[in-house]
Amino acid sequence: MNDRYLYRAKRTNNGEWVEGYYAVARDRKGLTQHNILIADNDIGYFKWIVVDPSTICQCTGLKDKNGKLISENDIMVAHLDDSFPEDTTYTRVVWNNNGFCTKEQGSEDISPLDKFDQEYFEVCGNIFDNPELLEVGE
């Protein structure tokens, strides 16, 4: 599976994160369901996992400095100045118009997600499980 097309979201039945393809379908009652499809190699089909649509995050296809995939709504951290180790920068990964960007805490400015972010930042959480990380320093 190409990383760029991966999605992740929280299951509705237990709140666990699942990762796979994203699909919208209707259930037997005609209600819209948001699903993550996970390949079940034992039987050659996909498992359809119902997820909370408010937690759906698309993978950027990029990896952080530790090789971890970066997804929409991830929170990344970096120590950009070794002479001031207490000076920590937190950013949130967001979608803006035509691409993934980073939005630094306490700022309205956004910057394209790029190689600099991959080299210096690491994923340290996400806005759903770790919202307090964005409150640091505000």
Model-derived features: positions:
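Secondary-structure transition motif
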Residues: M1-E138
